[in-house]
């Protein structure tokens, strides 16, 4: 089965000024596409050849895992963003965040602290644990909650290619801008699923 680059859920210029069209040209059009291309080169003739992307992520290791997980992580990241994003979550997700962190502002502070403190390349995730509570998880490189019992709700990509064009080496500024485009509707849908 050949894997393809999923379409973005928004136009490449729709996230400006928080994320530029140029960033999306490179991040989506080059980096994400390269993971798809590499995966398609790695799986022919293997046990992964006819598996879904999620099955490959859960069952693979090495280069196959790195590329398949990065395809999945990036697709999840694009869905974690919206030109109509920002604001704060509502309903059950807001209740879960407030129960864990005391307030949405305290959650944002903790999320930003974890994302800023992620050493090297990786991801910061808001996840739902099996007991129904939420947590903030940092993963390195291509690691993903998909291989755990936690359910991903929302993520931010903290690899340098995610922000270097717009923010240079200022990861905290990128994280601050992220709150303007965070897709809380997507996170709430994941929380309820």
From Swiss-Prot:
One of its GO terms (molecular function) is superoxide dismutase activity. Optimum pH is 7.5. It catalyses: 2 superoxide + 2 H(+) = H2O2 + O2. It is an enzyme of class 1 (oxidoreductase). Its EC number is 1.15.1.1. It comes from the Bacteria. Binds 1 Fe cation per subunit. Keywords: Iron, Metal-binding, Oxidoreductase. Fe cation binds at residues 27, 74, 157, 161. Signal peptide: none annotated. Its cofactor is Fe cation. Monomer. Belongs to the iron/manganese superoxide dismutase family. This is Superoxide dismutase [Fe]. It comes from Burkholderia sp.
């Amino acid at each position: 089965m050949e894997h393809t680059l999923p379409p973005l859920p928004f136009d490449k210029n729709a996230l400006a000024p928080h994320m530029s069209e140029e960033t999306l040209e490179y991040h989506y059009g080059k980096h994400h596409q390269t993971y798809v291309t590499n995966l398609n080169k790695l799986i022919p003739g293997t046990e992964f050849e006819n598996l879904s992307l999620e099955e490959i992520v859960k069952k693979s290791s090495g280069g196959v895992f790195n590329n398949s997980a990065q395809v999945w992580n990036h697709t999840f990241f694009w869905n974690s963003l919206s030109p109509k994003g920002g604001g704060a979550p509502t309903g059950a997700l807001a209740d879960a965040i407030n129960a864990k962190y005391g307030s949405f502002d305290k959650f944002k502070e903790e999320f930003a602290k974890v994302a800023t403190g992620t050493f090297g390349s990786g991801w910061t995730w808001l996840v739902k644990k099996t007991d129904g509570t939420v947590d903030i998880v940092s993963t390195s490189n291509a690691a993903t909650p998909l291989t755990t019992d936690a359910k991903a709700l929302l993520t931010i990509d903290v690899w340098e290619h995610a922000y270097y064009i717009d923010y240079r080496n200022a990861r905290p500024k990128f994280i601050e801008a992220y709150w303007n485009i965070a897709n809380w509707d997507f996170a709430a849908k994941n929380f309820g699923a």
